Each structure stands twice: as C-alpha cells, then as structure tokens.
C-alpha cells in the first residue's frame, strides 16, 4: 500500500512538472532560494561544529558542567544536555540529527536518545520570533508566551518519560580522548553539506507540491490549511495574507509550527535513517504535542487578544 501511494505521488508530481513546467520551475527556484538564503547559512555552521564536537570528544568537556544543573529538572546525560541545547536553541532538524549521530557513535543510551528525539526536534526560537511573529503575523510582545506554549508541552513530556526511565538503563561510558584532527574536520564538513543538501532537496520538492496544491479547485480555507500541513514557511505566509482575525491566525500559526509540516517529518526521517529511532512513534508524539499547543494557543488568544 505504501509503495503504491509513493508511486502514485511520484506520477502526479511528474505530470504536474510536465504540464506546468514554468510554475514547477518557479516553485523549485523559490524553494532553493529559501534554502540558500535562510537554511544553509543558519544550520550549516552548527551542523559542522556539532559533528566536530561529537567525534573529537570535546562535547563531554563542554557539557559536563551543565549536566548537574539540568538534572535538577530533567535527568539527562551530558550527551542529552547537548541534544537538548542544540534542539531547542538551533531548532529543527539539529535535535534529530544529533540524536542519530550520538546513537550511531554509541555515545548515548537508545532509550534516552528515543525520548530526546521526540521532544527536541522543534522550530528554532529565532524563526518563531522573527519570521512567524514579526514578519508574518506582525505581533510584538508575544515571543515569550509563544515559546512557552510551543516548548513547555515537549519539556514536560520529556521530564515525565525520562523520570520513568530506569536508572540501570543509563549508558555506562568510558572517558573519551579529546582531540581535533583535520580528518575529523573534513568528515564533519562533508557530513554537514550532505545533511543540508538533503534538506534542500526536500524543501524544493515540497515547494513544487505546494504549487501543485494551489491549482486544485478547493475552497481557500482548505487550501491554506493544506499548505500548512505540507510546509509551514509557505503555509504561514499564505495564512498571514488572509483577512481572518488575528486570533485565528495566531492559533493556526502556532499549531502549524508545533506540527512542523510533512516536509519537516520527511526531513526528520532522512536524519535518523539507519538508526533504531521510530518515526511512527515520533509522529504520534508530534500529533499529541501539536494538540497541546493548539489548546494552549486557544487559551492565550482568549485572554490576550
């Protein structure tokens, strides 16, 4: 069934490119420009630095002092601290990428990696504050509460799951030697570019798919919701240009941001390929956290707008 659906989707996408080549090329260009101007310069440096830290052994030195403070509210290892910081500060898909990298290197227990994988693959606070709130919704003074309703459900779920994790399941580590060589740096650069090129490919494909969806004879509200389900950057832009109330725009924008779009799920799947991390469970948790954010956004809109 899955293979048939994928084959059908490929045929539809190919037919659209052949029938509407100008629109498809324009959508592809827009997607690649978004990747080149926004995603590549933001994520590539950190992708390279993350790989260097993980494979050189310096990550332990960086996180050992932070671990004791994190354990007051979340029982994580030093590697878990690194995943939490990278996932929440630098945003999607660094959380899932670092979970996969540490798991492949056998530097984190699979159970801890699985839990952190569920909760750290979020949209970055910079994107939320600058693009969504200021550029699109033109809302000032909403950054703090927006971060709260997007991140707190994930953090609470993470605390509950990590506290349930049995102590004996913790990974026993031996001290790793810290060294940085040109071989490690070269490998980190190649890994970073491979990761970002893969992300760029998904952004391009989903940009073409959104262009296809816009030609469907569907009511405008349905089209806007569908675009947000597919990819949030273009989806939230379309949402912001409607004449809907600011309450409705805010609720839907926060809900779409929590979900991350099918494009985000596809990119996440490519990051964790070859590991034991379950995409099925990830999607279920993502839907649950999206529902929590939706309810919190409704409550916020009632009291603040």
Region roles according to the model:
Residues 7-9, 31, 35-55, 184-212:
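Core transmembrane alpha-helical segments of multi-pass membrane transporters/permeases
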Residues 18-25, 173-186:
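Short, membrane-interfacial amphipathic segments enriched in basic
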Residues 22-33, 138, 219-220:
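Membrane-interface helix termini and inter-helical loops of multi-pass transporters
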Residues 42, 46, 50, 67, ...:
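Alpha-helical transmembrane segments in multi-pass membrane proteins
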Residues 185, 189-257:
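Transmembrane helical segments that form the transport core of multi-pass membrane transport proteins
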